[in-house]
Amino acid sequence: MQWALGRRWVWAALLLAAAAVLTQVVWLWLGTQSFVFQHEEIAQLARQYAGLDHELAFSRLIVELRRLHPGHVLPDEELQWVFVNAGGWMGAMCLLHASLSEYVLLFGTALGSRGHSGRYWAEISDTIISGTFHQWREGTTKSEVFYPGETVVHGPGEATAVEWGPNTWMVEYGRGVIPSTLAFALADTIFSTQDFLTLFYTLRAYARGLRLEFTTYLFGQDS
């Protein structure tokens, strides 16, 4: 009995050590990456269009991002609004850029929604174009409310409760281990809604982003 208990402790210690090593390797890898976008750059661009009709704001933002970062934003024919079910909430996203370490997307909800933010190996910032974003941070007893032009930052490993009012739309930038965010983003789709067409759309959008980055890396911005 004691021998079996000892083995369990050994395995637990080994798993914790492996997790610690993996975490260190991941952050060392991120430290070697050269990033296309910056958090403040995306936030400043989004703030320019805060308060406008969200569709007009998004169209202008896309034009500006393509001007500043040619070869890194998906073309119009590959942009698609896709439902996202995660953490008990429902929204929609339109992916503009994706790689192994970054993404830029448009996100929001026409009806309003609330749920769990998820925990990620990534830092995520959302700059609000319209509507309201309520955030209740873990370990606190009060929530915060963010309005158009303000930026909400979600740090690596953090968890919050989130709530968006009707017609809340924002620009989101994520930096970190982006494939690790897919498990949370797709869990409700796989195990709850079982909307496998949406699952396909989501994976296709990410694959398109990776393909664009690979093509730009190999052949340059004009490919």
From Swiss-Prot:
It is a single-pass membrane protein. Residues 31-223 are cytoplasmic. It is found in: Nucleus inner membrane; Nucleus outer membrane; Nucleus envelope; Cytoplasmic vesicle. Pfam families: ERG2_Sigma1R. Residues 1-9 are lumenal. GO terms for biological process: lipid transport; regulation of neuron apoptotic process. The record marks 126, 172 as: Important for ligand binding. Keywords: Cell junction, Cell membrane, Cell projection, Cytoplasmic vesicle, Endoplasmic reticulum, Lipid droplet, Lipid transport, Membrane, Nucleus, Postsynaptic cell membrane, Receptor, Synapse, Transmembrane, Transmembrane helix, Transport. Its main location: nucleus. Residues 99-106 are annotated as: Important for ligand-binding. Residues 2-8 are annotated as: Targeting to endoplasmic reticulum-associated lipid droplets. It comes from the Eukaryota. The keyword GTP-binding does not apply. InterPro entries: ERG2_sigma1_rcpt-like (IPR006716). One of its GO terms (cellular component) is nuclear outer membrane. Residues 177-223 are annotated as: C-terminal hydrophobic region. The chain crosses the membrane at residues 10-30. The C-terminal helices form a flat, hydrophobic surface that is probably tightly associated with the cytosolic surface of the endoplasmic reticulum membrane. Homotrimer. Forms a ternary complex with ANK2 and ITPR3. The complex is disrupted by agonists. Interacts with KCNA4. Interacts with KCNA2; cocaine consumption leads to increased interaction. Interacts with RNF112 in an oxidative stress-regulated manner. Belongs to the ERG2 family. Functions in lipid transport from the endoplasmic reticulum and is involved in a wide array of cellular functions probably through regulation of the biogenesis of lipid microdomains at the plasma membrane. Involved in the regulation of different receptors it plays a role in BDNF signaling and EGF signaling. Also regulates ion channels like the potassium channel and could modulate neurotransmitter release. Plays a role in calcium signaling through modulation together with ANK2 of the ITP3R-dependent calcium efflux at the endoplasmic reticulum. This is Sigma non-opioid intracellular receptor 1.
